[in-house]
Design a protein with these regions (language model features):
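N-terminal, charge-rich interaction modules
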Residues: 1-20
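Short amphipathic alpha-helix segments
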Residues: 30-53
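Short linear motifs at secondary-structure transitions and domain/linker junctions
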Residues: 1-5, 40-45, 65-68
Length: 100
């Protein structure tokens, strides 16, 4: 079990769910990515989150452009939805405590 600071608490209906994040995905979309293209990107992220949740994994938004996830495959899937020429995406492996 991870330390308390490394465990993210997620509120879902009346049930408390705890996850241990393994990967941190940070993205910085260019201002060139606008309107309908942004909407498509966020819809893809929601679809990835839903698919992961159905398999017992969770992806959490921590800040506007920061996501925590439990699997490498989820992190790579998230990174692949962004237009790489106009978005800077970084994936970090969580090895210690995360404090926000």
């Amino acid at each position: 079990m991870a330390s308390d600071a490394q465990v993210v608490k997620r509120r879902k209906t009346d049930l408390d769910i705890f996850i241990e994040p393994e990967y941190l995905v940070v993205f910085d979309m260019s201002s060139e990515v606008r309107g309908s293209e942004r909407v498509k990107i966020y819809r893809k992220i929601r679809a990835i989150r839903k698919a992961a949740e159905e398999q017992g994994r969770y992806i959490e938004w921590v800040q506007k452009s920061v996501l925590l996830c439990m699997s490498r495959d989820d992190a790579l899937a998230l990174a692949s939805v962004f237009p790489m020429s106009r978005t800077k995406v970084r994936i970090f492996v969580v090895t210690g405590e995360i404090t926000w």
